[in-house]
Amino acid sequence: MPNVVVVGAQWGDEGKGKIVDLLTQYADVVVRFQGGNNAGHTLVVGGEKTVLHLIPSGILHPGKSCVIGNGVVIDPEVLVLEIDRLKAKGALKDDGQLVVSLDAHVIMPWHKAIDVAREQAMGEGKIGTTGRGIGPTYEDKVARRGLRIRDLLDEARLARKVKERAALAREELARLGAKLELDEPALVKRYAELGRRVAGYATDVSIWLHRALQQGKSLLFEGAQGTMLDVDHGTYPFVTSSNTVAGNAVVGCGLGPTAVDYVLGISKAYSTRVGGGPYPTELKDETGERLRKLGGEYGATTGRPRRTGWLDALALRYAVRVNGLSGIAMTKLDVLTGFDTVKIAVGYRLDGKVLDEMPSDPEVIERCTPVYEELPGWTEKLEHLRTWDDLPPRARAYVKRVEELAGVKVVGCSVGADRGETILVENPFLAR
């Protein structure tokens, strides 16, 4: 069995969790390699909804191992809460089902305080952070002053690092006109207790995964957010604080690039975005609101309404290039049922010219207007369909046109929220 990376091909919220949940049956191990609890995966299995923010989606499959890699930033309060909820459901047992990297960095209370204070200070220039401390935690990681999971397991070391870092945080918050109310001894005790709660799951993930590969096990790497939010390749500065592209999958868990055999990009049949930043196909009219309502486009983590728009073929083609996508899975195709026409942006108009590739400068993207290609819509319900040939001809034509514009095969379509409401044309785990 090959090893497969699943990444978002848009601005996040593409439905990666559902596709990972579907593909987990073919993998032995599911690996989360970046991001934090700013991501939310909503899974519906047998009509029951489960929302996960840190633990990989594959945890709902008995007999599978789930790994949180060194590239993830962890709020231990959230991690322990998810562990407790999954245990209560009987979905998590203490048998090696969950593995957490000792080297994953820890989100501390000052990271959240700094995140919120900075966003408030930016006024109209807000990036749209979730306020969960993700960015400041990654900053501390790069500045070599962060705390890691392993630090929670040594209370004396934890106390020393908390004292050093809290002092710096107070200085920064004072410059932002904010204060950090912190009882350091109580904080150390609380985080040491959280450390004891996760100690049984914590290990050297690089060694653990290397041994899994030696045993012939197959890996499924689960990305968070999306390509257009990548800190290097997204619409900077309106991005997240980590690399969301496929190349980071192995970096974020301690393996080499030869561990990856197939890269699957997830794209909605339309598009959405949360927070600020350029979004050429955004619809601020009744059509946009219709997409929002039909698609349930409200954040799994924040609950805030998502911006909505037509599919952007330039952005999708960009995602194909920077991820080296082997195939695309299209989600929420059913949401487009009932539209008289459906549109795809096939170019951008800028200063009297038509561009066929997405500009690298977000300020230039802001000045672009989309050039649309219109296709006839369909009225048939899709939720009960299970094969490609069952799809209405117009829905098939839409998918094939997206495939042509993206330059890579659409290997699956989601036609409903439940795990089973999916048409898989080509299984990435059986593609080689």
UniProtKB/Swiss-Prot annotation:
Source superkingdom: Bacteria
Keyword field: Cytoplasm, GTP-binding, Ligase, Magnesium, Metal-binding, Nucleotide-binding, Purine biosynthesis
Binding site for GTP: 12-18, 40-42, 306, 332-334, 414-416
Location(s) in or outside the cell: Cytoplasm
SMART domains tied to this protein: Adenylsucc_synt
Catalytic-site annotation from UniProt: 13, 41
Residues engaged in binding Mg(2+): 13, 40
GO biological process entries: 'de novo' AMP biosynthetic process; IMP metabolic process
Record's catalysed reaction(s): IMP + L-aspartate + GTP = N(6)-(1,2-dicarboxyethyl)-AMP + GDP + phosphate + 2 H(+)
Binding site residues for substrate: 300-306
Cofactor remark from the record: Binds 1 Mg(2+) ion per subunit.
Cofactor(s), names only, from the UniProt record: Mg(2+)
Gene3D superfamilies: Adenylosuccinate Synthetase, subunit A, domain 1, Adenylosuccinate Synthetase, subunit A, domain 2, Adenylosuccinate Synthetase, subunit A, domain 3
Binding-site list for IMP: 13-16, 38-41, 130, 144, 225, 240, 304
The protein's Enzyme Commission number: 6.3.4.4
Subunit structure: Homodimer.
Family the UniProt entry places it in: Belongs to the adenylosuccinate synthetase family.
Protein name per Swiss-Prot or TrEMBL: Adenylosuccinate synthetase
Gene this protein is translated from: purA
